[in-house]
């Protein structure tokens, strides 16, 4: 089975330098911590996708703050070849309550940026590092 396509990923910024992570319940990367996100549906923009996927996976309504970047992920994991082109966005919660989607998510965790798990899915560690090392100091200071 192969997976290929455009995806959208969210860094959900919470108070006190925390972000929200999800533990994947599906392959590839089953059991790995990840940023919420998923595949872009036909006729959908990446911005619409990130808002929809966060709501589906975590129960949170979010607003997009800014785009972190565009990425290319390619590899084989759990016997599955994948090639994704994710757009990563910084988002903030504006409503809803944290509630995991049973089908795709094993667990939801609030993680401090200083204590991010080493075992992350896809290129999510790079996305988090890009967020932490943002060129804009005002954006970095918005963590607190």
Region spans (language model):
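Conserved N-terminal beta-strand and adjoining loop/helix that marks the start
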Residues: 1-19, 86, 90
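A generic structural micro-feature
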Residues: 2-4, 32, 79-85, 102-105
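Short, charged/polar surface micro-motifs in flexible loops or helix N-caps
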Residues: 13-19, 28-29, 70-74, 91-96
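Conserved Nudix-box catalytic region and its N-terminal flanking loop in Nudix hydrolases
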Residues: 18-56
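A short coil-to-beta-strand element that immediately follows conserved catalytic motifs
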Residues: 60-70
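Active-site-adjacent beta-strand/loop module that shapes the phosphate/pyrophosphate-binding cleft
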Residues: 72-97, 131-132
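NUDIX/MutT-family hydrolases
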Residues: 90, 99-130
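Charged phosphate-binding loop/patch that engages nucleotide di/tri-phosphates or the phosphate backbone
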Residues: 125-144
